[in-house]
């Protein structure tokens, strides 16, 4: 439950097309569906820290949320290519109403997120100190 330190690549943008029109960005954009989740199941090595179809048998972070936190969300490529169980999953750049600490993610206000989207591309990296 701690934000990892380092320099990391960013993944695609996932967004709620029912709430937000397609943002201006050079990132690949994927609409979030109700059946999307991000696997955080320590018993599921195959899918750990990956996008999955929601399955009640697999522990996951819901991508389709009632709050607006994941209306815009970019997975940060931490523990990503060959994820190690328990090292951390679902480390995201997402929306917040304020700048209070998160459980390991980076959260910014929607207006700031939209500005960032105009500036970043698939080669952009995030530095977390």
What label would you give each PLM region?
Residues 1-103, 111-129:
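Cell wall/extracellular polymer interaction/catalysis modules
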Residues 108:
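A conserved hydrophobic position in a structured secondary element of the catalytic/binding core
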């Amino acid at each position: 439950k701690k934000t990892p330190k380092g320099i990391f690549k960013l993944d695609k943008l996932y967004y709620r097309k029912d709430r937000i029109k397609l943002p201006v960005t050079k990132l690949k954009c994927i609409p979030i569906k109700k059946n999307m989740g991000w696997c955080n199941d320590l018993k599921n090595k195959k899918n750990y820290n990956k996008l999955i179809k929601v399955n009640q048998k697999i522990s996951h972070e819901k991508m389709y949320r009632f709050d607006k936190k994941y209306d815009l969300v970019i997975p940060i490529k931490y523990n990503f290519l060959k994820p190690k169980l328990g090292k951390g999953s679902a480390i995201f750049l997402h929306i917040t109403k304020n700048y209070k600490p998160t459980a390991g993610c980076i959260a910014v206000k929607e207006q700031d997120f939209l500005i960032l989207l105009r500036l970043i591309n698939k080669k952009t990296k995030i530095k977390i100190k």
